[in-house]
């Protein structure tokens, strides 16, 4: 076996080992990690919700920090919803 074949074999082996270790946990839809073996909900780590600051566009699924969102003109003169 020459050097190139040995390097390729080591890369394949490292990839296989990495895939086997990566099977133990998978990222859930909010960025936390969930175990394959059915851990309880309190053991799943999730990111904390974040509110949108003043003068930022109002997103569809998040609340503004101030609690209100109104139509305002942007730099192009168009009306857009922004957090108060």
Swiss-Prot record:
What keywords tag this UniProt record?
Answer: Calcium channel impairing toxin, Cleavage on pair of basic residues, Disulfide bond, Ion channel impairing toxin, Knottin, Secreted, Signal, Toxin, Voltage-gated calcium channel impairing toxin
Name the record gives this protein? Omega-hexatoxin-Hmo1b
Q: Which GO terms describe its biological process?
A: defense response
| Propeptide, chain numbering | 23-45
Query: Where is the secretion signal located?
Result: 1-22
Record-annotated site: Critical for insecticidal activity: 57, 74, 82
Q: Does the keyword Nucleus apply?
A: no
- What family does this chain come from, according to its entry? Belongs to the neurotoxin 08 (Shiva) family. 01 (omega toxin) subfamily.
Q: Which domain of life is it from?
A: Eukaryota
């Amino acid at each position: 076996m020459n050097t190139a074949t040995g390097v390729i074999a080591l890369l394949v082996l490292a990839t296989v080992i990495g895939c086997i270790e990566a099977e133990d946990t998978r990222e859930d839809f909010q960025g936390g990690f969930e175990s394959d073996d059915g851990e309880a909900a309190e053991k799943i780590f999730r990111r904390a919700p974040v509110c949108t600051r003043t003068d930022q566009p109002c997103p569809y699924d998040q609340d503004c920090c101030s609690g209100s969102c109104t139509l305002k003109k942007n730099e192009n003169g168009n009306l857009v919803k922004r957090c108060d």
